[in-house]
Structure formats: structure tokens, C-alpha cells
């Protein structure tokens, strides 16, 4: 099989993702590289030092959050890491996702695929990674002021989102987005969208979408239109904050 080397590929886009992703597995996989693991650990230390005046308050919002991040990074294998309830807390997931993206861009750079050779796009929280990673991290991440500042901000942002406890995220799958009676926060595909809000708001979305689906399916049963029934699936995305909430 003939594979083109990365540096020979042109017009490439790299997507940095956000919440409701397998960020724990990704971060753990990067941590199995001893060089990257050490860099991540030192970067976390530097970011914690940066927020030293408020670090105690931040750590009290989600006790054990920092320990969980260190546990993921120190895992011998990504298979050793299983999702835990604390992972849904933005205080853990927001810095965890950014740290994983820093590691990913570094590994691409080690292959000769540096940031100037591709266009980076951020989905959701991924915009933070795009802004942070306009160039390849240096030899010592803890001395890179830009990296330290962004990771420190991620810790503060995540803690603030966890403290606010203003909702969750729910996906709606199987329904053409044009049939949705309430505008979603994010559209992932023609038949998948994400809503954010508190429990009452998401329950209202479920009722409205279910009613719209029932009405649509009824028109098929009465032969007012052709086609197949629409089957809707609702799923909690395991994110304890209403990202994309308006």
C-alpha cells in the first residue's frame, strides 16, 4: 500500500473538537509517550502556579478534578481509563480537552506536519485549541507563556462552568433538522442536533420534538405524504454544562 507522507499533502484541514468526545481516551493515549506525559504534567503545574491566587477556590468547586486529570495522563494504556462521573464536569473536561489537543498538535509536528501546513478549525470548545495552537509548542511547554496562559484559562473556565451548574447537553438523532420545532444549539448532521439547557428546558424540547415526530408520522399513515416513519432517539451527552446554550 502506497501512503503519501503527511508533508506532501496540501489543502488540509485539522478539526479540533469539544465536549461529548472521547477526550479521556485520547489524553491517556498521548500520555503513554513519556516525553509528552512529562510535558503535560509540567504544563499543568505551571498553569496551576499561574492561577495560584485562586487555586484553592478552583479546586474546591470539583474536588478531585485535578487528580483525575493526572490519573488519565499517567495511565499505562488508554484501555486502562474508563469514563467516570467526574469526567462530565467542565472543571475536568475543559482543561482535559485542551491538553489533549496540545498533545495532538505536537505529535503531528513530530511527523513534520506543523501548524503552518494546515488550516485548523475548532468545533465548540475546539476554538480555544485553535487560538492556542497557532504554532508548534516549544521544547519546554511549561516555559511557553502562551500555552500556560491558555491552560490556566481552561482551568478557570471549566471551574466557572461547573460552579454555575446551568444545564446539560442532549442529542436528538433521527429527525431531519428541518422538522425540529425548536432551534437547536448545534447541528451535527442533517439528522442529528444538540440542545442545551436545564432539566425543564430539555424536557420541553423532548415533548415538542416527540409531538412533531408524531404529527409527521401521522401524515404518512393517512397517505398525505410518502416516505418512511421518522424514529427519534434522545441521548444525554454526559456533559454537566449547557454548552451552546442561548
Q: Locations of the language-model features?
A:
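FabD-like malonyl-/acyl-CoA
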Residues: 2-177
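Alpha/beta catalytic cores of group-transfer enzymes, especially the acyltransferase/condensing modules
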Residues: 133-246
Amino acid at each position: 500500500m502506497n501512503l503519501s507522507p503527511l508533508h506532501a499533502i496540501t489543502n488540509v484541514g485539522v478539526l479540533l473538537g469539544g465536549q461529548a468526545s472521547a477526550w479521556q481516551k485520547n489524553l491517556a493515549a498521548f500520555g503513554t509517550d513519556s516525553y509528552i506525559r512529562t510535558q503535560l504534567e509540567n504544563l499543568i503545574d505551571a498553569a496551576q502556579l499561574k492561577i495560584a491566587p485562586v487555586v484553592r477556590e478552583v479546586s474546591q468547586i470539583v474536588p478531585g478534578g485535578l487528580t483525575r486529570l493526572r490519573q488519565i495522563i499517567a495511565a499505562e494504556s488508554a484501555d486502562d481509563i474508563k469514563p467516570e462521573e467526574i469526567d462530565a464536569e467542565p472543571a475536568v473536561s475543559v482543561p482535559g480537552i485542551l491538553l489533549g489537543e496540545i498533545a495532538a498538535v505536537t505529535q503531528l509536528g513530530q511527523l513534520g506536519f506543523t501548524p503552518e501546513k494546515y488550516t485548523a478549525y475548532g468545533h465548540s470548545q475546539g476554538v480555544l485549541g485553535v487560538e492556542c495552537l497557532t504554532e508548534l509548542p516549544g521544547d519546554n511547554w511549561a516555559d511557553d507563556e502562551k500555552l500556560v496562559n491558555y491552560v490556566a484559562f481552561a482551568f478557570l473556565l471549566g471551574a466557572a462552568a461547573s460552579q454555575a451548574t446551568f444545564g446539560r447537553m442532549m442529542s436528538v438523532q433521527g429527525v431531519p433538522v428541518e422538522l425540529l420545532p425548536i432551534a437547536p444549539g448545534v447541528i451535527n448532521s442533517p439528522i442529528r442536533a444538540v440542545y442545551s439547557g436545564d432539566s425543564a428546558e430539555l424536557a420541553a424540547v423532548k415533548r415538542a420534538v416527540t409531538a412533531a415526530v408524531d404529527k409527521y408520522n401521522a401524515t404518512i399513515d393517512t397517505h398525505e405524504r410518502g416516505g418512511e416513519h421518522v424514529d427519534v432517539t434522545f441521548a444525554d451527552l454526559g456533559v454537566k454544562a449547557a454548552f451552546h446554550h442561548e
